Amino acid sequence: MNQIDLNNKIAVVTGGGQGFGYSMVERFSQSGATVVIWDKDKDLIESLNLPKNVTAVQTDVTSYESVENSVKETLSKHNKIDILVNNAGIAGPSFKTWEYPIDQWQNVVDIDLTGVFYCCKAVVPHMVKSDYGRIVNVSSIAGKEGNPNAMPYSAAKAGVIALTKSLGKELSDKNIAVNCVTPAAAKTRIFDQISQEHIDYMLSKIPRGRFLKVDELASMVSWLVSEENSYTTGAVFDLSGGRATY
């Protein structure tokens, strides 16, 4: 493992209790950061055997009040937030667009897009005050390509890409970098929400012929949240195994 220097940094990872999120939590903590997991699943975060430099706060990213409370709790313990990774997300069920249940559409968009906005809205002012921050939003190859039978997820993840570009420009005169990654699928708990037909479809589109490994995403993101990434902002970093066409 290449070592990235995150010493003395305070990092928040939403949806950090499993999958992509926990892989980043582990990588950041091994690189010297103090990490705070924001996750809605109380039972999950209580079951984790966390390193000394990792704590968890129950957070519902669809509630701005919950996000604000988590910011206050994190700042009360650590005085700052240097790194924010907006990773919390769900895939939602598989339906044709015209058959998609309205409540399920809203649920996916609330978590996958509005949750990113809420966390940025609550955290960015503190980064501006300290003139330092690194934000990475976890989008998806679906946000570029638009997966069939996954319209809300694809639309929300496309929105995350646009949000990243807008926020990156707004903060470009400060020592704050805002970028996003567009991973292909990985074998995480999110697969429990997806039909086998859709899983097979996603794999068939990846030229490398395999799904992404969670530590491969963590490796890229660990550099994006480091001080070394002092120039690139508002950018989209591909992790699709060759699937992306732009």
Model-found features: residue ranges?
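Alpha-helical segment proximal to the catalytic Tyr-Lys
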Residues: 125, 169-173, 230
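Active-site helix of classical SDR
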Residues: 120, 156, 164
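Substrate-binding pocket helix/loop in short-chain dehydrogenase/reductase
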Residues: 95-97, 101-109, 191, 202
